[in-house]
Amino acid sequence: FSLILLLALALYALTTLPSLRATYAEQPMLFGRITACITAFGILVAVALTLLYQYDRSGALVSNFLSHSGNQITKELVDAFSAGQVSLLEQPSKELLALENPYDWSQRTAAGVSYLWDHLLFDGKYYSYYGVAPVLLLFLPYHWLTGAYFPTPEAVLLFGALGILFLSLFFLEFVKRFCRRIPLNILIASLVILQCSSGVWYNFCSPLFYEIAQTSGFLFTCLGLWLLLRSGVIGEGRVRLGALCGATLSLGTAVLCRPTLALYCIASLPFLAYGFLKYTEGRATGWARVRVAIPYLCAALLPYVILGGGQMLYNYARFGSFLDFGIQYSLTINDFTRAQYHTDFVAIGFYNFLLAFPQIKPDFPYVFSNYSALSTNGYYFLATNNAGGLLWRAPTTFGYFGAVGAWRAMDKRERRMALLLLLPVCVIAPAVILFSIWESGYAVRYCTDFAWQAVLGGMAILYLLYARRAEKQTKQILQVAFLVAAVLSLAVNAGLIYGFMSRDGYLESQYLALGRCFDFWK
């Protein structure tokens, strides 16, 4: 009841207080302070979810930071790099190598051979297809300093919490540059929706080595896009080469965490081209302009060249090909060496990540997953049976239906910028990522790669409609709609995350008591 009362008071303040109905241009400091509070609360929630996971399984709140065990990211890759090799130290068994097709799960099961699950098998050696950036930046230095292995849950918390911070900073910079005429109550609701629907929370509930790749990629993508805005390549102000270099360095590092995120490097190229024209405009002509452009090109492209070249050399050292990341050599249920494309599998991902309407029940937490395989024939890997479409987890995503009206409200220059800048980051990259997961199956954590970017695009359309086309009464309706969307986003995401958490450990009775607190009418 107290939580409901606090939420009601917050909504009352957002709808009535003049300072919260003022625009960002009128109250920039206030919005900055509120952003800091929302971010701090989000990080506290991340800590709480991690502690719940830890205690529910071991009865201890924190991991052993002097542990001598780990997984293929925290230990096996660390040991391999320490030994000066790219293959893992453990050798495949002769029985495994003797199989006609060791990538066939049924053959491995029938023969009863031992093998490392979800590792790569190539040319008689084990490898890992997970990105090397977390290893080089955290796990390997920690091992060299302490002789121990950094624990996985705390690593996921570290990467995820920093990602939450930089997502807020990105949104603050986005507002500062493009949304100064939008009221604070809309912006506050938007930040709540953006953070709630980012998908990073699922990683704290089940922090395994998969989630290391997911959260580290999330961190460096948010950091890179924030620095890209701060660099001034678009919007007012001069171009900052230091921030630009940091942006491409971060986005390139995200690829070394999770190769799928290379799409955001590609999406950044129109930003870099636009910034190049801005940086060199009126400064020189002919060859003199080339000399002026060299520092910009180095800051913008050199990190991509160095990091991309390093990844290609790493690929070649393992698989004899610069462009082979090795995913097809995985020892899992699916034989990726013989994988066949099926449009039905693509549809499963699009439906569950974007459209699936969650189940509503009169039992806590009231909102439940509604995953569907769409009656597809054949085997489709399901890692986590937890689904709720982005349209319902972030109702402002419906803003895309106003794209035609927003397009008509823009002049030619703004249309060009929207096509070159907003479309690649918020629409094309998320859509391609969604398309690409058909081969891997469904896991709710995958939304961490694209969710907030897709949500931002819908919000941007609504902001433009508010500023350009809405009358006074329509603006009031939009303000209320954003607040309602924030409440729905908070409720739906909280319910889905609660349903994703395990409740069969030390805290089973406490989870039951929590549910009874909300079911106060029973």
What are these regions, as identified by a protein language model?
Residues 376-416, 463:
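Hydrophobic, aromatic-rich transmembrane alpha-helices
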Residues 83-130, 144, 171, 195-204, ...:
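Interfacial juxtamembrane loops and adjacent helix segments
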Residues 148-180, 223-227:
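Transmembrane-helix motifs of polytopic, lipid-linked glycan transferases
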Residues 264-305, 408:
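Perimembrane helix-loop-helix junctions
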Residues 2-72, 187, 288-303, 478-484:
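Start-transfer (signal-anchor) and selected internal transmembrane alpha helices
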